[in-house]
């Protein structure tokens, strides 16, 4: 009887998990990078990344980055770099109200559009080893410049009044008397953020495998450290040889910032690094 109850509970848990997954998006993030070390302290790297979203059917962004790092001490490392980002902004809907601020008068519906971004980062990473575990904390400052962009915008205005017999336009279950397709100019802007990451890595004795888990949170420095996004990752680094490294992982990301979709996402990441 107890076994049946356990089986039933396990089945219900799986169903709940499946329901949760259905409410979130799924993506695949792939990356390729190269790294060159100059002695034991200084190294440079370059890499490209591609992210697919909407159940891994549509591109969300791709980027190219250059970076460098310097080990000040065995436990302390400094880093800096530049990343060019080509990102897709998803549809955004903003309700419009009358002067009273309460009565709905319509919607502005911005279509999807692509935007270029330029990012500089500076970081400090501290780490400590305990047995076969390595604990690390990275604090990264991000400066991102958003280029100007243009998108299509649907403007729905004026709710249908009693006795109206003209054309109507339906959006979000509401009928409107006016509709206009226009373009909207997105102004260039700058953003400053702090991204903190805590990671625990384990070195498996006798195997070239290092499983790890990490938690990362990003806060907006220009808005009183407002929460932007968080990311949980569980992965496995496989050192195939001294020069070839593979990285596999699962990511769950939640965000309040709508720059790239304002949604929760489950993602599988696959990365390859070549070390000169």
Residue ranges and their predicted role:
Residues 1-8:
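Bacterial N-terminal signal peptides that target proteins for export
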Residues 41-49, 85, 92-106, 171-180, ...:
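Flexible, solvent-exposed coil segments and beta strand-coil junctions
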Residues 53-55, 59-61, 71, 75-153, ...:
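Outer-membrane beta-barrel translocator/channel fold
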Residues 26-28, 60-62, 116-120, 188-194, ...:
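Residues that define the transmembrane beta-barrel architecture of outer-membrane proteins
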């Amino acid at each position: 009887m107890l076994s049946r109850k356990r089986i039933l509970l396990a089945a219900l848990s799986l169903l709940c998990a499946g329901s949760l997954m259905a409410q979130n998006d799924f993506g695949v993030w792939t990356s390729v990078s190269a790294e060159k070390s100059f002695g034991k302290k200084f190294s440079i790297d370059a890499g490209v990344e591609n992210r697919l979203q909407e159940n891994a059917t549509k591109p969300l962004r791709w980027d190219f980055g250059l970076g460098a790092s310097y080990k000040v001490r065995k436990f302390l490392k400094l880093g800096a770099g530049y990343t060019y980002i080509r990102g897709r902004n998803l549809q955004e809907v903003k309700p419009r109200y009358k002067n009273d601020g309460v009565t709905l008068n319509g919607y502005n519906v911005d279509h999807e559009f692509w935007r270029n971004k330029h990012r500089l980062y500076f970081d400090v990473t501290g780490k400590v080893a305990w047995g076969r575990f390595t604990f690390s904390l990275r604090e990264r400052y991000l400066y991102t410049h958003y280029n100007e962009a243009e998108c299509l915008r649907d403007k729905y205005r004026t709710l249908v009044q009693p006795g109206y017999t003209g054309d109507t336009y339906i959006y979000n279950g509401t009928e409107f008397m006016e509709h206009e397709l226009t373009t909207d100019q997105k102004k260039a802007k700058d953003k400053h953020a702090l991204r903190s990451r805590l990671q625990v890595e384990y070195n498996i004795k006798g195997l070239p495998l290092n499983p790890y888990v990490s938690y990362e949170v990003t806060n907006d420095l220009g808005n009183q450290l407002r929460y932007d996004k968080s990311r949980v990752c569980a992965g496995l680094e496989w050192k195939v040889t001294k020069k070839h490294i593979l990285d596999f992982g699962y990511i769950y990301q939640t965000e309040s910032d709508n720059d790239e979709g304002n949604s929760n996402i489950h993602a599988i990441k696959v990365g390859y690094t070549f070390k000169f």
